[in-house]
């Protein structure tokens, strides 16, 4: 990642970032902002923006004070970044690197949200407990079990910390990760990151259903933020779930799913629709007329199920998963053409938020074992993070685990 002429440590980066003169953009594109402080972190139930930069970090320092200082610095920076504050270099410090990386100067907040999470490795791997945090690890915060057919790349999976930056302007999202990476210098190092474009789900009732790179509407039956009962039951950690520091938080699971376009593009329209279980143009379930028609899993025609047993919509349905649901908030991605193959390296960067990771695990087991979509996709990266609730004003993300 581009880090500028020189990295800035946590203390220096924070002091310089907040010490310049604040200027607000005068452009008219990408306005609007979401407050950083709330009962839950932003970027979860917030209306899904069009662009994402997801980054994970490994903590290189062994001092718990460095970790807490980093989280404090990140929180302070996040408050300013999400408000759209922009900083100019001090005219008296022209011999020093500028306080802000600069690529967002003149841009508005673009509804930027920053969501932070803690990976299992932060709480100790095997017998190692470098920060004395093992006692705070939620029992369910473990790497998901292996799933049939996946081909995970370890260098693009896992991580001690994650930051999800979402915005209507991709440069604003990039700028946020760039700034936070710069602040982390000397305490944590970027492990891997993923750029995403074009949301693949709707998180509020006012949003229309987008299409994924396979051309199908995606996330029709997603949980909506206005459905507070469903959010409470399926997304937000409750006081009885434990540990206390995760109450009002959630668990993030990310999966990088490559689409095998050579296979998919050669599949007939009927084959594609039977693979998904929906009509490609309208998004209606097979046997239905409109996108939001009830998915009838019992309907037959000519003695055959209208929605096949291995259709994605059947296997992912709450009706076949003991009522389990997850909040999807993924994005499309495209890296480049693979050298010598002519194949496009593109697909879905799947992100799901859930009250308990077992919700995702149970659903994914069914999909991995039986989903017709597996012939057209391959999972190449995976990560899980505990996302605590929003800190209180003046506090910092995850502060209670250091008390």
Language-model region placement:
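Long, histidine/aromatic-enriched segments associated with O2/redox biology
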Residues: 3-403
């Amino acid at each position: 990642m581009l880090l500028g002429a020189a990295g800035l440590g946590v203390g220096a980066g924070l002091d310089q970032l907040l010490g310049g003169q604040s200027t607000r953009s005068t452009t008219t594109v990408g306005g609007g902002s979401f407050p950083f402080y709330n009962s839950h972190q932003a970027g979860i139930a917030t209306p899904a923006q069009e662009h994402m930069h997801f980054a994970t970090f490994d903590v290189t320092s062994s001092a718990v004070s460095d970790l807490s200082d980093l989280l404090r610095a990140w929180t302070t920076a996040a408050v300013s970044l999400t408000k759209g504050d922009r900083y100019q270099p001090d005219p008296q410090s022209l011999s020093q690197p500028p306080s802000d990386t600069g690529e967002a100067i003149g841009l508005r907040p673009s509804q930027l949200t920053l969501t932070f999470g803690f990976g299992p490795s932060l709480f100790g791997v095997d017998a190692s407990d470098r920060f004395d945090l093992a006692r705070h690890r939620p029992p369910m915060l473990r790497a998901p079990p292996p799933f049939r057919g996946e081909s995970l790349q370890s260098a693009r999976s896992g991580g001690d910390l994650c930051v999800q930056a979402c915005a209507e302007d991709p440069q604003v999202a990039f700028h946020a990760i760039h700034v936070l990476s710069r602040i982390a210098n000397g305490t944590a190092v970027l492990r891997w990151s993923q750029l995403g474009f074009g949301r693949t789900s709707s998180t509020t009732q006012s949003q229309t259903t987008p299409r994924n790179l396979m051309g199908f509407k995606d996330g029709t039956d997603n949980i909506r933020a206005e459905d507070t009962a469903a959010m409470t039951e399926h997304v937000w950690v409750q006081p009885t779930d434990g540990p206390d520091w995760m109450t009002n938080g959630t668990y993030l699971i990310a999966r990088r799913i490559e689409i095998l376009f050579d296979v998919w593009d050669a599949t007939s329209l009927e084959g594609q629709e039977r693979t998904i279980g929906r009509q490609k143009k309208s998004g209606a379930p097979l046997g239905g007329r409109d996108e939001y028609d009830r998915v009838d899993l019992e309907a037959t025609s000519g003695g055959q199920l209208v929605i096949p047993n291995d259709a994605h919509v059947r296997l992912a349905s709450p009706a076949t998963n003991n009522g389990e649901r997850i909040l999807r908030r993924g994005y499309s991605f495209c890296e480049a053409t693979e050298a010598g193959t002519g194949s496009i390296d593109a697909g879905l960067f799947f992100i799901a938020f859930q009250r308990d990771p077992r919700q995702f695990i149970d659903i994914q087991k069914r999909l991995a074992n039986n989903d017709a979509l597996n012939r057209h996709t391959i999972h190449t990266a995976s990560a899980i993070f505990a996302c605590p609730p929003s800190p209180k004003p003046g506090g910092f993300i995850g502060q209670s685990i250091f008390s």
